[in-house]
């Protein structure tokens, strides 16, 4: 008996010997590709470029599997792959079949090639009943080839109507049988139409103009179906006999007629491909080329015979048609309708002068027919109870007109109410009162009133009045009164003239030297609209071009940005001024620029304050507050402290320092700071102040959670224990007080500035073991 000695090693000599026993023939020698008598190879199909899996169904798990391949037309059996379960090997020559791999005992071929078409033999080594057996499985693999994209070929892409045309659907490759279908799409047609089945050739005999358009063919086999690009068949034909149309359309016994001074359009159309070339004649004289001839203003001299000649230049053929045009002269244009506004009544006017005879006109309204007259007619109509959107029509009739001609007037109530606004003009010397109430028909009438006294004349849809600017206009109220026939009296709007009022964001701003300062003010009210501006400490107007200053207008707000604050140039009182034609108002903002001095005496005249160090910085109230404690050292006078914060630890990406507290008394040594975001890590520093002189900033620290206190636990144990436990606990606290660094602390070490003269010493940690025994 022959067996495998190991399942987790590469193929060894014993396995190779077994396969030599399995292999009926040597590699490269002829070997019968069919099974024994009565057996047939299993048929398997695969698609080129896809994957196929050849299964070797052998029953029990085999000890080894060998796959071989015999191409069609060959008797040479070629090894493909071998596996023992624990290891496998694929022959390099298997690349001709595709990307070959083994999945258990199955042979998987990806990116299948046509060279894989042929017979496959699966030989397996089995152990059954203590004996080694071999099994064989024959498979026949058929590789199917998808059809390639077809292409339509026309023997004549531009035939003349009446000849024979053949279209061929050419396919480069594809497994037969192939199925063909033809589709036709006319340029102005609704869509594709099936015109042929099964044949690769489509014959159009004889071809006519209905065959013009795009032709596509579809080819399919068992694998796929593809459609060709369209091929255009351009059928040459025509021209047919031209058809002449006249607009506006009017028929007479001898042809067409049109009204004098109307625009008359004569159009000619003759079916032809390529399109016809058109030439117009009047009484045998050429007057125009092109399919359309337009008489911009017809007169009686345009009466005559008009001929359209259509010419196909490709075939050099032509046809023609002649019609007669007669010009009549009714009244010019059409009736003209107008409406005049009066209180409670509308006066409707309709006129249509000229023509022979005069046109007959009559009005018709929502409640019936109105008056009639010749040439012009007037109708005064009471608007009481008249709905919005009422339509009045004036009908004009003339013997030369087949249909009456209308003009219409629709009465519309203007929406809403009048709208008032005011602007200043000519250097604030005048104030312009403006009032508007659009959208009405007839237009609304508007007028300005001052204490019920009319100002100026009535205006239609809009009223404007100029006032000379003067201070006594402040507080005065002006009314714009509107009226319309369809609305109830009393529609108005009012304006109150006011001197501007403003407010500042902060009346006092303090920044350190070299930092940015922001001063803000907002306009609260003012009519006419006011202009905001900033004045510097020397009462000079600050503009966008002023060095060191940037203005940020935001609607009714104007913010002033002071860059690189300098106490010598930027300290002082700034004014935000609001100005309109009635006057102005202002608010002051004091900007303090605090100096950081490097020596004992600052250039500003105040001695340098002492240095400050942060001794404790802990969180409070779920990290929404911090408790800050500090100490001072070194000589110097002080008048207070300044605390700064920023939303990150010090780094190149850290934000600018912001003032967290500045009104701290000189005797204070702690401060609680609130308004923090629990999700943000803050950094803090503190400076001592001597009037406007700032000392060195302290080291930068970030807050930590408060350390755990052992007092409650110890006292509880002492209360329930013996005196010995109490004495031992007191010894623990005494030792901790003398050696604070021997106990762990949750506060992280802070970074001290390199300029800080004081460096903290850190003792080496001491391990202490304390045992407390309490007896209840």
From Swiss-Prot:
Transmembrane residue ranges: 713-733
GO CC annotation, single: membrane
Cell compartment(s), UniProt: Membrane
Signal peptide limits: 1-28
Topological type in the membrane: Single-pass membrane protein
InterPro entries: FN3_dom, FN3_sf, Ig-like_dom, Ig-like_dom_sf, Ig-like_fold, Ig_sub, Ig_sub2, IgSF_CEA-related
Gene3D superfamilies for the chain: Immunoglobulins
Domain Ig-like: 32-140, 150-234, 242-324, 399-498, 500-592
Domain Fibronectin type-III: 608-708
Glycan attachment sites: 611, 637
Keywords of this entry: Disulfide bond, Glycoprotein, Immunoglobulin domain, Membrane, Repeat, Signal, Transmembrane, Transmembrane helix
Main location: membrane
Pfam families: Ig_3
Disulfide bonding pattern of the chain: 56-122, 169-217, 268-308, 435-480, 521-576
Keyword Transcription: no
The name this protein goes by in its record: V-set and immunoglobulin domain-containing protein 10-like 2
């Amino acid at each position: 008996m022959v067996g495998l000695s190991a399942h987790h090693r590469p193929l060894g000599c014993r396995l190779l010997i077994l396969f030599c026993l399995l292999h009926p023939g040597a590699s490269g020698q002829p070997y019968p590709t069919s099974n024994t008598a009565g057996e047939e190879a299993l048929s398997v199909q695969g698609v080129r470029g896809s994957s196929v899996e050849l299964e070797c169904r052998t029953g029990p798990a085999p000890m080894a599997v060998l796959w071989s391949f015999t191409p069609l037309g060959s008797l040479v059996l070629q090894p493909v792959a071998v596996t023992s379960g624990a290891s496998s090997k694929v022959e390099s020559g298997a690349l001709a079949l595709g990307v070959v791999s083994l999945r258990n005992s199955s042979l998987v071929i990806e990116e299948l090639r046509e060279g894989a078409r042929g017979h496959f033999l699966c030989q397996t080594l089995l152990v059954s009943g203590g004996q080694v057996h071999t099994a064989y499985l024959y498979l026949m693999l058929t590789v199917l080839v998808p059809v390639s994209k077809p292409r339509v070929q026309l023997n004549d892409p531009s035939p003349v109507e009446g000849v024979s045309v053949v279209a061929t659907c050419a396919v480069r490759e594809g497994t037969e049988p192939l199925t063909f279908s033809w589709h036709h799409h006319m340029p102005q047609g609704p869509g594709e139409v099936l015109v042929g089945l099964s044949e690769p050739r489509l014959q159009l005999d004889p071809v006519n103009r209905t065959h013009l358009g795009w032709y596509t063919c579809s080819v399919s086999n068992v694998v796929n179906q593809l459609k060709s690009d369209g091929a255009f068949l351009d059928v040459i034909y025509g021209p047919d006999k031209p058809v002449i149309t006249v607009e506006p359309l009017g028929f007479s016994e001898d042809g067409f007629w049109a009204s004098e001074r109307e625009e008359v359009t004569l159009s000619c159309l003759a079916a032809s491909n390529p399109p016809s070339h058109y030439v117009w004649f009047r009484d045998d004289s050429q007057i125009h080329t092109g399919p359309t001839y337009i008489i911009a203003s017809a007169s009686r001299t345009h009466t005559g015979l008009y001929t359209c000649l259509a010419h196909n230049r490709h075939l050099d053929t032509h046809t023609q048609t002649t019609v007669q045009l007669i010009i009549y002269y009714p009244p010019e244009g059409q009736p003209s309708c107008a409406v005049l506004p009066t209180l409670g009544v509308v006066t409707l006017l309709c006129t249509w002068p000229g023509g022979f005879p005069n046109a007959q006109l009559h009005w018709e309204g929502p409640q019936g027919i109105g008056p009639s007259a010749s040439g012009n007619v007037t109708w005064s109509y009471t608007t009481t109870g008249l709905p919005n959107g009422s339509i009045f029509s004036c009908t004009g009739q003339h013997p030369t007109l087949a249909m009456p001609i209308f003009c219409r007037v629709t009465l519309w109530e203007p929406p809403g109410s009048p709208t008032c606004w005011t602007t200043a003009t000519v250097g604030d010397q005048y104030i312009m009162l403006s009032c508007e109430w659009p959208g009405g028909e007839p237009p609304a009438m508007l007028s300005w009133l001052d204490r019920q006294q009319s100002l100026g004349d009535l205006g239609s849809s809009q009223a404007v009045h100029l006032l000379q600017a003067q201070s006594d206009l402040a507080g005065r109220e002006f009314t714009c009164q509107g009226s319309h026939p369809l609305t109830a009296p009393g529609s108005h709007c009012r304006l109150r003239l006011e001197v501007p009022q403003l407010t500042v964001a902060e009346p006092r701003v303090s920044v350190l030297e070299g930092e940015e300062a922001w001063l803000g003010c907002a306009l609260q009210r003012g009519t006419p609209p006011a202009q905001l501006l900033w004045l510097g400490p020397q009462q000079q107007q600050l503009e966008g071009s002023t060095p060191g200053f940037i203005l940020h207008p935001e609607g009714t707000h104007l913010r002033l940005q002071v860059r690189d604050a300098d106490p010598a140039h930027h300290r002082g009182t700034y004014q935000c001024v609001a100005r309109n034609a009635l006057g102005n108002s202002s608010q002051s903002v004091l900007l303090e620029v605090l100096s950081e001095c490097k020596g004992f005496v600052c250039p500003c005249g105040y001695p340098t304050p002492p240095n400050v160090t942060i001794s404790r910085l802990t969180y409070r109230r779920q990290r929404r507050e911090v408790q800050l404690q500090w100490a001072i050292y070194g000589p110097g006078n002080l008048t207070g402290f300044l605390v700064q914060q920023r939303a990150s630890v010090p780094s190149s990406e850290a934000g600018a320092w912001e003032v967290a507290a500045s009104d701290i008394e000189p005797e204070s040594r702690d401060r609680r700071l609130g308004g923090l975001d629990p999700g943000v890590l803050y950094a803090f520093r503190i400076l001592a102040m001597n009037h406007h002189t700032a000392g060195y900033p302290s080291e930068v620290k970030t807050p930590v959670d408060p350390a755990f206190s052992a007092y409650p636990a110890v006292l509880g144990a002492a209360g329930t224990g013996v005196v010995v436990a109490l004495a031992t606990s007191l010894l623990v606290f005494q030792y901790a007080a003398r050696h604070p660094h021997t106990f762990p602390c949750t506060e992280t070490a802070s970074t001290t500035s390199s300029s800080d003269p004081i460096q903290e010493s850190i003792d080496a940690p001491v391990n202490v073991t304390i045992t407390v025994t309490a007896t209840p």
